Swiss-Prot record:
InterPro entries linked to this entry: ATP_synth_asu-like_sf (IPR023366), ATP_synth_asu_C (IPR000793), ATP_synth_asu_C_sf (IPR038376), ATP_synth_F1_a_nt-bd_dom (IPR033732), ATP_synth_F1_asu (IPR005294), ATPase_a/bsu_AS (IPR020003), ATPase_F1/V1/A1_a/bsu_N (IPR004100), ATPase_F1/V1/A1_a/bsu_N_sf (IPR036121)
Family to which this protein belongs: Belongs to the ATPase alpha/beta chains family.
Protein keywords: ATP synthesis, ATP-binding, CF(1), Chloroplast, Hydrogen ion transport, Ion transport, Membrane, Nucleotide-binding, Plastid, Thylakoid, Translocase, Transport
UniProt enzyme class: translocase
Sites where the protein binds ATP: G170, D171, R172, Q173, T174, G175, K176, T177
UniProt xrefs under CDD domains: ATP-synt_F1_alpha_C, ATP-synt_F1_alpha_N, F1-ATPase_alpha_CD
Marked site positions, Required for activity: S363
Natural source organism: Bigelowiella natans
Lineage, uppermost ranks: Eukaryota, Sar, Rhizaria, Cercozoa, Chlorarachniophyceae
Name of the protein this chain belongs to: ATP synthase subunit alpha, chloroplastic
Function (record text): Produces ATP from ADP in the presence of a proton gradient across the membrane. The alpha chain is a regulatory subunit.
Gene Ontology terms: cellular component: chloroplast thylakoid membrane; proton-transporting ATP synthase complex
The keyword Thylakoid is assigned to this record: yes
Gene name as annotated: atpA
Length: 497
């Protein structure tokens, strides 16, 4: 007969009852009920936050973009082909962040900072939010350090300072990217880390930029964020924010960073596409009502930090494309009002053979003059005045049949001054060379040189300045000033050449 150990069974039941865990694990989940065009509609997830990362059953990640009464509009960060109706979606309680660090220098990454250059994974223990708050007023100080672009026309008349936001604007194929790349090339040896964000560009164009940076030795201090034309609208939308997060790492560590957005017109178009698919009300040019905030919250992150925060800086060079030179369109006017100045590139000047095709008349730098080196300030004032007078005289001379000798001389000098502002692509000039060339032009040393021979004259002048580097170049680089002593050295060089 079977003996039942009732005491043992009772003690086991008692033990189980005492140690019973009645805690319920709750997961905030939703269900996919519509998917298409990179947009997913999710039912449920009542506690989801705007901008929260959502995890789909098959591993995809999306961002909660529209919080509506009965559902959530989610934009996907990847491919939507594997997502099906009825799939479970979980909230993560987190917002987007990307890994950051020095190891990203020299690498090409996507909008989520994943490497796409085939050089292996990037191991980083630090992360930054894709959209953190911008530095406050107390956290900033005024712009006072120059950021040399190496382009004479910009450094002389539209100077840029570290921490400034300077818009590069113009029609397609007018050299906007070339100006930005020249600026990156000129940061070599200046302890400025660069981030180039390509939004909606052709893959071949991005490859060309990479090749240029590699050939010139600039990729070592540059991070390239690629959101090519074949990526989703969401990836193109977040690429500038991710690129800024990578640059902010250097700024908050006391270094100087430069970020180029090429270009924000494409980002606005991607945002418009997402908004229209989410059925947001369209406004002017079919852009949503918050498209100004799209760019203002991005560009406000550029700053010159106060000494208490390390004194780092983040300089932004956003690029915006215009149609037929129309700067009064929606996106151009928005970005012009957000930035601290603009460099306007004109297709007429470009087609006339002047490169870089900068229209100095309507280009402006609102805060850069405070950062311009004294040496440049001393020679650039005269250049601006003479070019302005030349532009006025040139327009007048078209209607005049005979001109007096003084006017003819002024026109001849103006043509030579315009000639010295021409510069080959990917050939940035150092500060001492720029000062020497402008001084030669404004003080009449080029008046007897024919316009065709000016490029060769400039080449020989830069060689002469290199030979006298200890007396002229080194002094200007160390003091950033152009005193009588340096002027006498320069006059001797010019008279000898």
């Amino acid at each position: 007969m079977l003996n039942i150990a009732t005491d043992e069974i009772c003690s086991l039941i008692r033990y189980r009852i005492q140690n019973y865990n009645s805690e319920l694990k709750l997961n905030n989940v939703g269900v996919v009920f519509k998917v298409g065009d990179g947009i997913v509609r999710v039912f449920g997830l009542q506690g989801a936050m705007a901008g929260e990362l959502l995890l789909f059953e098959e591993g995809s990640v999306g961002i909660a973009f529209n919080l509506e009464k009965n559902n959530i509009g989610v934009v996907l960060l990847g491919d939507c082909t594997l997502i099906q109706e009825g799939m479970i979606v979980k909230g993560t309680g987190k917002i987007g962040e990307v890994p950051v660090g020095d190891k990203f220098l020299g690498r090409i990454v996507d909008s989520l900072a994943n490497p796409i250059d085939g050089k292996g994974d990037i191991v980083s223990s630090q992360t930054r939010l894709i959209e953190p708050p911008a530095p406050g007023i107390v956290d900033r100080r005024s712009v006072y350090e120059p950021l040399q672009t190496g382009i004479t026309a910009i450094d002389a008349m539209i100077p840029i300072g570290r921490g400034q936001r300077e818009l590069i604007i113009g029609d397609r194929q007018t050299g906007k990217t070339a100006v930005a790349i020249d600026t990156i090339l000129n940061q070599k040896g200046k302890d400025v880390k660069c981030v180039y964000v390509a939004v909606g560009q052709k893959s071949s164009s991005i490859a060309q930029v990479v090749t240029t940076l590699q050939d010139k030795g600039a990729l070592d201090y540059t991070i390239l964020v690629s959101a090519a034309a074949d990526t989703t609208a969401t990836m193109q939308y977040i690429a500038p924010y991710s690129g800024t997060a990578l640059a902010e790492y250097f700024m908050y560590n006391g270094s100087h960073a430069l970020v180029v957005y090429d270009d924000l017109s494409k980002q606005a178009q991607a945002y418009r596409e997402m908004s229209l698919l989410l059925r947001r009300p369209p406004g002017r040019e079919a852009y949503p009502g918050d498209v100004f905030y799209l760019h203002s919250r991005l560009l406000e992150r550029a700053a010159k930090l106060s000494d208490s925060l390390g004194g780092g800086s983040l300089t932004a060079l956003p690029i915006v494309e215009t149609q037929e030179g129309d700067v009064s369109a929606y996106i151009p006017t928005n970005v012009i009002s957000i930035t601290d100045g603009q460099i306007f590139l004109s297709s007429d000047i470009f087609n006339a053979g002047f490169r870089p095709a900068i229209n100095v008349g309507i280009s402006v730098s609102r805060v850069g003059s405070a950062a311009q080196p004294k040496a440049m300030k001393r020679v650039a004032g005269k250049l601006k005045l003479e070019l302005a007078q030349f532009a006025e005289l040139e327009a007048f001379s078209q209607f005049a049949s005979d001109l007096d000798q003084a006017t003819q001389n002024q026109l001849a000098r103006g043509k030579r001054l315009r000639e010295i502002l021409k510069q080959p692509q990917y050939s940035p000039l150092s500060l001492e060379n720029q000062v020497g060339i402008i001084f030669a032009g404004t003080n009449g040393y080029l008046d007897k040189v024919s316009i065709e021979n000016i490029p060769s004259y400039i080449t020989s002048l830069t060689e002469s300045l290199k030979n006298e580097k200890s007396k002229f170049g080194d002094v200007i680089l160390s003091t950033k000033d152009f005193t009588k002593d340096e002027e006498n050295v320069l006059r001797n060089i010019l008279e000898a050449s």
